[in-house]
Structure formats: C-alpha cells, structure tokens
Amino acid sequence: MSHRKFSAPRHGSMAFYPKKRSARHRGKVKAFPKDDASKPVHLTCFIGYKAGMTHIVREADRPGSKINKKEVVEAVTVLETPPMIVVGAVGYIETPFGLRALVNVWAQHLSEECRRRFYKNWYKSKKKAFTKASKKWTDDLGKKSIENDFRKMLRYCKVIRVIAHSQIRLIKQRQKKAHVMEIQLNGGSIEDKVKWAREHLEKPIQVSNVFGQDEMIDCVGVTKGKGFKGVTSRWHTKKLPRKTHKGLRKVACIGAWHPSRVSTTVARAGQKGYHHRTEINKKIYRIGAGIHTKDGKVIKNNASTEYDLTDKSITPMGGFPHYGEVNNDFVMIKGCCIGSKKRIITLRKSLLKHTKRSALEQIKLKFIDTSSKMGHGRFQTPADKLAFMGPLKKDRLKEEAAATTAAAAAATTTSA
C-alpha cells in the first residue's frame, strides 16, 4: 500500500472559500467601529481611488532601536480622495434579528452622477429617479413627512448612518457613475447625530475631517484580477519532480478511491484574484490638500516637506502610470494596498485599539519621491530636468516656428 511517508500542513487557507470573483466592485464595509458618545460626531468611512505608489524618506522614532533617529526609506501608496457629498440619512432600530432600517430621508437635490448609479442605461431612461423624494421638500405635506421621519429617528433609532457618494467627475476617469455607500455616524448622542446628518445634507465632506495624521486605518476593496490559474499559482502547491508524467504543476493525488468524489479541501485550478478583501492596520503618512487657489495663487506644493522645500506636486513626472494626475485631496498610506490602478478603495477607521509603538509612532517625512515611475527616473521636477539637460532641440524648433509666424504676421500688417 502506497502512502506518504511524511505529513505536511495543507497549502493555502480555506478561510476565504469560495475563491470566486467578487459580486461587488466597491469594497463593502461589514462592520463599523464601536461607538463612543464622548467623542464629537464624525464619519467612520471614506471612499478613495488608488493612484499608484512611490517612496519616502523619514526619520525613525524608535527609542532603544539601532535605527532610532536614522533615515529609513519606505514604500507608500497614494489614494486620491475627492470630497464626498451627503445625500441622505438612514435610521436603524435594534431588533432580536439585528439592526433593521426604519426610515430613510433623501436630500432635495441629487447630482446627475449620483442618479446615474441607479440606472443601467442612463440615456434610454426617463431620468425620473428621486423626483418624488425631491418634491417632498417643496410642498407642505412632504415637509411634514420629512419632519415626522426625523422625529422617528430621534425617538426609536439607535444607529444613524448617512448616504454619501463620491465625486467621480473630479478624477480623470471615463466612468460617470458615482459610488454610493452608507457610512455610520459615531460619537455624540442620537440627537447630535440626527442634527449632524440634517445639517450636512447636500454638503461636501473632506477626507481631513474623517481621518487624521498618523492614524491607523483599514482598506476594504477587491483585489487585482488574475483570471483562471493553475493549482500551483493559485494554491502555491509544490511542483512535482522533473520526470513526472503529464505535467509538473499539478496535485499528484486528489484523494482516495472512496469516498468516490473530490473533497472540497483539495487544491484545484480556478479563478485567482478579484476577491473581496479587508486589509487592516495601514498607517496614514500624510493627508494632502489638492491643487487649490489661495489669495489668487494656485497652490500645488503638496509634496514638499520641512527638509525638501522644492515646489512640487504629489503627482510624479509624467503622472502615475495607468492613472494620471492627482489634483484632489489625497491620502498617503504606508506600504501597498489591494486592487489595481483606478480601483475604488473604501477607507475605514480601525476597529481595534492600538497600543503598539509602531502604531503610535509620529511620522516626520523628510522627502517624497516624485520622479518618473515609467522607468529609472532621475529628476524630481521639470525644472530639475531643464537645469540638467539644458535647452532641448524641440524647444528651439518651437521658438523658431513662433518667431517665423510672428515675422510673417508683421510683414502682412506692414504691407496692408
């Protein structure tokens, strides 16, 4: 009787079964942080879009460690986070079967990008979504109904959540449908939460009002899709010896004769990637303001530091590959992040209470790399490149063409 001589742990985890494509593209938040009434009312989640990665140089703050007060280089991910718009409020009551929604209140005006989310084909539709909800704000009966709904929230509801959508038009994507999600309000009493939700209807919320510097957050999203993959790539099983008949990247024995079926615990080929996952404990290194105007001047230097005073934007030279420019507010987190470029990532406040020194460490950035990510970039800004390369031939040709055009225009004017 043949059998294995040695035992070994199984390859891969079965905790994520079934390994199939996610049913949703946007990361779903299945749990919110525990409420604390002593804190002011605040949102617990935000929507961001993955732009790309770069690296930073910072000074380590680890007393007792060999690298304390020394410079360390770390990889970071940049997520573009344009302001979100609050368009509704939902009140939940506690039942023996869990939370159940009691009342919904929608804002009077919903943007086109938000209403597009509720249609499969916007151009063939009648575009009448939320017309009844908006009419409530104009007639007397509707206003009474809205006031009654808010009174129900105050009297019966234990959990208040707001409905907010991203502003997809502010980022350089072809998509026109905004992403809509429910976000739980934490902090304060129920009266404070209802008041906050009512005051912020149709108003933008900045990411800086939700998260803070050096905060630990969670990233919820869908991983990068890999398609149909073999068992070795999908489960990281051991390759068979070189002389094995009919392939090496296989499982040699997929089970016993009886029971006469393949067990669900056996590694098999199939879908890899595009799975819904939650990554916890991502530290925020910087929350940067987008390109804005202040005192009549356009402010772009959101990648400069106290040590690097260069006037530069977080967008690297040539833009982030397969994404482009980051012109809105952004969040820079340590390390990598799930998903491909342009993938929507739901950022959530951490569910845990952090006590580790690495989580409480204060981050002081010295340098943010903005060189080209298409290759081995050498220059941080176009000014650096111009100073090193000198005047280029194409620039000289443009100047000559402009001079020729100006001379021809002057000659025409003189002759006339």
Curated annotation (Swiss-Prot):
Major subcellular location class: cytoplasm
GO CC terms in record: cytosolic large ribosomal subunit; cytosolic ribosome
Domain of life: Eukaryota
UniProt-recorded Gene Ontology molecular function terms: RNA binding; structural constituent of ribosome
Keywords, comma-separated and alphabetical: Cytoplasm, Ribonucleoprotein, Ribosomal protein
Gene3D superfamilies per UniProt: 3.30.1430.10, Ribosomal protein L3, domain 3, Translation factors
Cell compartment(s), UniProt: Cytoplasm
Any single Pfam family the record assigns to this protein: Ribosomal_L3
InterPro entries: L3_arc_euk (IPR045077), Ribosomal_L3_dom_3_arc_sf (IPR044892), Ribosomal_uL3 (IPR000597), Ribosomal_uL3_CS (IPR019926), Transl_B-barrel_sf (IPR009000)
Xref: PANTHER family: 60S RIBOSOMAL PROTEIN L3-RELATED, LARGE RIBOSOMAL SUBUNIT PROTEIN UL3
Similarity field: Belongs to the universal ribosomal protein uL3 family.
Protein name per Swiss-Prot or TrEMBL: Large ribosomal subunit protein uL3
